Amino acid sequence: RRVLFRSVCNRTIKKHTVSKLYTEVNTIPSNNVGLLLGTSPKLKSGNNNLYFDYRILATVELYKAGKIKYILISGDNRKEDYNEPEEMKKALMQKGIPEKSIYLDYAGFRTLDSVVRAKEVFGQNRLTIISQRFHNERAIYLAEKNGIDAIGYNAQNVNAYAGLKTNIRELLARVKMFIDLGMDKQPHFLGEKI
Protein backbone atom coordinates (compact mmCIF):
# COMPACT_ATOMS: atom_id res chain seq x y z
CA ARG A 1 0.00 0.00 0.00
CA ARG A 2 2.77 2.44 0.89
CA VAL A 3 4.52 1.82 -2.42
CA LEU A 4 1.23 2.33 -4.27
CA PHE A 5 0.52 5.57 -2.38
CA ARG A 6 4.03 6.90 -3.13
CA SER A 7 3.56 6.00 -6.78
CA VAL A 8 0.17 7.75 -6.98
CA CYS A 9 1.58 10.88 -5.31
CA ASN A 10 4.49 10.95 -7.73
CA ARG A 11 2.34 10.45 -10.85
CA THR A 12 -0.21 13.05 -9.73
CA ILE A 13 2.46 15.72 -9.28
CA LYS A 14 4.15 14.95 -12.60
CA LYS A 15 0.83 14.96 -14.50
CA HIS A 16 -0.27 18.32 -13.06
CA THR A 17 3.03 20.13 -13.60
CA VAL A 18 4.51 18.83 -16.86
CA SER A 19 3.13 21.73 -18.95
CA LYS A 20 4.47 24.33 -16.51
CA LEU A 21 8.13 23.32 -16.57
CA TYR A 22 10.77 24.90 -18.80
CA THR A 23 14.40 24.13 -19.51
CA GLU A 24 15.06 26.70 -22.26
CA VAL A 25 15.29 30.37 -21.38
CA ASN A 26 14.00 31.45 -24.81
CA THR A 27 10.70 29.54 -24.40
CA ILE A 28 9.77 30.41 -20.81
CA PRO A 29 7.20 33.20 -20.35
CA SER A 30 8.26 36.29 -18.39
CA ASN A 31 7.21 36.98 -14.81
CA ASN A 32 8.10 39.88 -12.54
CA VAL A 33 9.40 37.62 -9.78
CA GLY A 34 11.52 34.51 -9.71
CA LEU A 35 11.30 32.45 -6.51
CA LEU A 36 14.72 30.87 -5.95
CA LEU A 37 14.42 27.92 -3.59
CA GLY A 38 17.27 27.80 -1.10
CA THR A 39 19.95 25.24 -0.47
CA SER A 40 23.40 25.30 1.09
CA PRO A 41 26.47 26.21 -0.99
CA LYS A 42 28.48 23.38 0.59
CA LEU A 43 27.85 19.72 1.31
CA LYS A 44 28.62 18.24 4.73
CA SER A 45 31.84 16.92 3.19
CA GLY A 46 32.91 20.51 2.46
CA ASN A 47 32.58 20.06 -1.31
CA ASN A 48 30.57 22.47 -3.42
CA ASN A 49 26.86 21.70 -3.60
CA LEU A 50 26.03 21.41 -7.30
CA TYR A 51 22.32 21.93 -6.61
CA PHE A 52 23.27 25.39 -5.28
CA ASP A 53 25.65 26.16 -8.17
CA TYR A 54 23.16 25.14 -10.85
CA ARG A 55 20.28 27.09 -9.26
CA ILE A 56 22.44 30.21 -9.21
CA LEU A 57 23.35 29.76 -12.89
CA ALA A 58 19.68 29.22 -13.85
CA THR A 59 18.61 32.35 -11.96
CA VAL A 60 21.31 34.48 -13.61
CA GLU A 61 20.27 33.11 -17.00
CA LEU A 62 16.62 34.10 -16.44
CA TYR A 63 17.49 37.54 -15.09
CA LYS A 64 19.95 38.42 -17.85
CA ALA A 65 17.44 37.27 -20.50
CA GLY A 66 14.83 39.65 -19.02
CA LYS A 67 12.53 36.78 -18.03
CA ILE A 68 12.38 37.93 -14.38
CA LYS A 69 12.89 41.41 -12.90
CA TYR A 70 13.18 40.52 -9.22
CA ILE A 71 14.46 37.52 -7.32
CA LEU A 72 12.91 36.34 -4.06
CA ILE A 73 15.34 33.96 -2.36
CA SER A 74 13.59 31.76 0.15
CA GLY A 75 15.57 29.51 2.45
CA ASP A 76 16.58 28.44 5.91
CA ASN A 77 18.65 30.47 8.37
CA ARG A 78 17.65 28.87 11.68
CA LYS A 79 21.25 28.40 12.78
CA GLU A 80 23.73 31.22 13.28
CA ASP A 81 26.25 29.66 10.88
CA TYR A 82 23.71 28.55 8.25
CA ASN A 83 22.01 31.12 6.04
CA GLU A 84 20.80 29.93 2.64
CA PRO A 85 19.29 33.27 1.48
CA GLU A 86 22.41 35.31 2.27
CA GLU A 87 24.73 32.76 0.61
CA MET A 88 22.59 32.73 -2.52
CA LYS A 89 22.39 36.52 -2.57
CA LYS A 90 26.21 36.75 -2.40
CA ALA A 91 26.57 34.25 -5.24
CA LEU A 92 24.06 36.12 -7.42
CA MET A 93 25.74 39.46 -6.81
CA GLN A 94 29.11 37.93 -7.73
CA LYS A 95 27.49 37.00 -11.06
CA GLY A 96 26.38 40.59 -11.67
CA ILE A 97 22.81 40.63 -10.31
CA PRO A 98 22.17 44.02 -8.64
CA GLU A 99 21.28 43.99 -4.95
CA LYS A 100 18.19 46.15 -5.61
CA SER A 101 16.67 43.24 -7.57
CA ILE A 102 17.07 40.71 -4.74
CA TYR A 103 14.68 40.13 -1.83
CA LEU A 104 15.23 37.63 0.97
CA ASP A 105 12.83 35.38 2.83
CA TYR A 106 14.62 33.94 5.84
CA ALA A 107 11.70 31.73 6.89
CA GLY A 108 11.63 29.35 3.93
CA PHE A 109 12.31 26.32 6.11
CA ARG A 110 10.41 23.99 3.77
CA THR A 111 9.11 24.25 0.22
CA LEU A 112 5.60 24.74 1.64
CA ASP A 113 6.81 27.74 3.65
CA SER A 114 8.62 29.26 0.66
CA VAL A 115 5.64 28.98 -1.68
CA VAL A 116 2.90 30.08 0.73
CA ARG A 117 4.99 32.96 2.12
CA ALA A 118 5.69 34.21 -1.42
CA LYS A 119 1.95 34.88 -1.67
CA GLU A 120 0.89 35.67 1.89
CA VAL A 121 3.91 37.71 3.01
CA PHE A 122 5.43 38.99 -0.25
CA GLY A 123 2.13 39.44 -2.13
CA GLN A 124 3.01 37.36 -5.21
CA ASN A 125 0.26 35.60 -7.16
CA ARG A 126 2.43 34.81 -10.22
CA LEU A 127 5.91 33.31 -9.98
CA THR A 128 8.69 31.61 -11.85
CA ILE A 129 10.05 29.01 -9.45
CA ILE A 130 13.74 28.17 -9.85
CA SER A 131 15.18 24.85 -8.73
CA GLN A 132 15.85 21.40 -10.15
CA ARG A 133 12.96 19.69 -11.96
CA PHE A 134 12.07 17.29 -9.13
CA HIS A 135 11.82 20.21 -6.70
CA ASN A 136 9.99 22.48 -9.15
CA GLU A 137 7.33 19.82 -9.71
CA ARG A 138 6.47 19.74 -6.03
CA ALA A 139 6.72 23.52 -5.60
CA ILE A 140 4.42 24.21 -8.57
CA TYR A 141 1.87 21.70 -7.30
CA LEU A 142 1.94 23.43 -3.89
CA ALA A 143 1.61 26.82 -5.60
CA GLU A 144 -1.45 25.69 -7.56
CA LYS A 145 -3.10 24.37 -4.42
CA ASN A 146 -2.49 27.76 -2.77
CA GLY A 147 -3.89 29.89 -5.61
CA ILE A 148 -0.59 30.93 -7.17
CA ASP A 149 -0.04 30.90 -10.93
CA ALA A 150 3.44 29.38 -11.11
CA ILE A 151 5.79 28.05 -13.74
CA GLY A 152 9.16 26.46 -13.15
CA TYR A 153 12.59 26.97 -14.67
CA ASN A 154 14.57 23.78 -14.24
CA ALA A 155 18.16 24.23 -13.18
CA GLN A 156 20.55 21.55 -14.36
CA ASN A 157 20.20 18.39 -12.31
CA VAL A 158 22.99 16.59 -10.49
CA ASN A 159 23.99 13.19 -11.88
CA ALA A 160 21.91 10.23 -10.69
CA TYR A 161 24.63 8.73 -8.49
CA ALA A 162 25.38 11.99 -6.66
CA GLY A 163 21.68 12.77 -6.33
CA LEU A 164 20.47 9.32 -5.22
CA LYS A 165 19.91 10.37 -1.60
CA THR A 166 18.10 13.51 -2.75
CA ASN A 167 15.86 11.54 -5.12
CA ILE A 168 14.83 9.14 -2.35
CA ARG A 169 14.21 12.07 -0.02
CA GLU A 170 12.09 13.74 -2.72
CA LEU A 171 9.77 10.72 -3.00
CA LEU A 172 9.13 10.93 0.74
CA ALA A 173 8.69 14.71 0.55
CA ARG A 174 5.96 14.24 -2.05
CA VAL A 175 4.03 11.91 0.24
CA LYS A 176 4.45 14.37 3.12
CA MET A 177 3.22 17.19 0.88
CA PHE A 178 -0.07 15.36 0.24
CA ILE A 179 -0.47 14.74 3.96
CA ASP A 180 0.26 18.42 4.67
CA LEU A 181 -2.27 19.53 2.05
CA GLY A 182 -4.87 17.18 3.49
CA MET A 183 -4.28 18.59 6.97
CA ASP A 184 -4.14 22.21 5.70
CA LYS A 185 -0.61 22.63 7.10
CA GLN A 186 0.56 26.26 7.26
CA PRO A 187 4.07 27.74 7.23
CA HIS A 188 6.05 27.71 10.48
CA PHE A 189 6.07 31.54 10.42
CA LEU A 190 3.62 33.56 8.37
CA GLY A 191 4.29 37.12 9.50
CA GLU A 192 3.14 40.52 8.28
CA LYS A 193 2.78 41.36 4.59
CA ILE A 194 5.75 43.16 3.10
Language-model segments: which ranges?
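Short linear elements at protein peripheries
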Residues: K185-I194
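A transmembrane-helix-recognition feature enriched in membrane-embedded lipid enzymes
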Residues: L164-Q186
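Short, small-residue-biased leader/transition segments that mark boundaries at the very start
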Residues: V3-L4
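A structural signal for short, hydrophobic/glycine-enriched beta-strand patches
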Residues: R11-N167
